[in-house]
Design a protein with these regions (language model features):
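A detector of single, family-specific signature residues
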Residues: 1-236
Length: 236
């Protein structure tokens, strides 16, 4: 009913806090369960979907055999843990807003944020890791800073200048670029938009590259785009 990705989301946590035991769910009407879900989603999820989820949860509760009583200390502990998670999540959201506001004070925010598929949070993270992009004289320096520069492999008289990436640079920057590329590709496919990153990803797929190689190549491509845009002070 709640996927593993959503278990720590607002909807799941509010539901668990309100109905922390199967016996409590058994005693509630389906519409009461659905109303809780609908309220937490702020209307984003259609009420019919909320009813479907509520029916499934009710069915699972009716077929369950809890190992603890509804008034046990474990149930109270669960409620307390949920409160802590909600509190920390709210604080994390506040920190994200502060980081975004700081990033907006730089000349790079609007430029990077104009790239399709990159949201404000990702933009702020990229700026936080790359810093002042104008301090890099060329893209090779920026690639090396992120550890995306290729290694040189020498075997006898043979030299391969296009080996695997060095991974010697900023690993956080690589991770953010990797995740951002995945987000751009998903959004591009969902909305049927042939962005530069999606086109490049499909090109690498056609070359029979495996997923990680494709995304690594896309990360390098994205970094080149960001570097050129920031140097030329131009939007996407």
């Amino acid at each position: 009913c709640f996927t593993s990705n959503d278990i720590y989301g607002e909807t799941s946590l509010n539901f668990i806090k309100e109905f922390p035991h199967a016996d409590i769910i058994k005693s509630k009407r389906i519409d009461a369960l659905a109303n809780n879900i609908y309220k937490s989603t702020k209307g984003y999820l259609p009420y019919s979907r909320c009813l479907t989820k509520a029916k499934k949860i009710k069915e699972l509760a009716n077929n369950s055999y809890p190992g603890i009583e509804v008034n046990s200390c474990e149930v109270n502990n669960l409620i307390n843990i949920v409160d802590i998670i909600i509190y920390n999540s709210n604080k994390l959201d506040e920190v994200k807003k502060d980081i975004i506001n700081l990033a907006k004070q730089t000349p790079y925010f609007d430029i990077i944020n104009s790239i399709y598929g990159i949201g404000e949070t990702s933009t702020a993270q990229i700026i936080a890791e790359l810093g002042d992009i104008n301090r890099f004289e060329n893209i090779k320096q920026l690639n090396a800073f992120c550890g995306l520069d290729p290694t040189i492999i020498q075997s006898g008289k043979s030299i391969n200048y296009n080996g695997p990436i060095s991974k010697r640079g900023n690993r956080n920057a690589r991770k953010i670029l990797f995740i951002t590329c995945c987000s751009i590709i998903r959004s591009s496919v969902l909305h049927n938009i042939d962005t530069d990153i999606l086109v490049y990803y499909r090109k690498k797929q056609a070359e029979k590259k495996h997923f990680k190689e494709c995304i690594t190549a896309c990360s390098t491509k994205l970094l080149r785009i960001i570097f050129a845009m920031c140097k030329n002070n131009s939007l996407y």
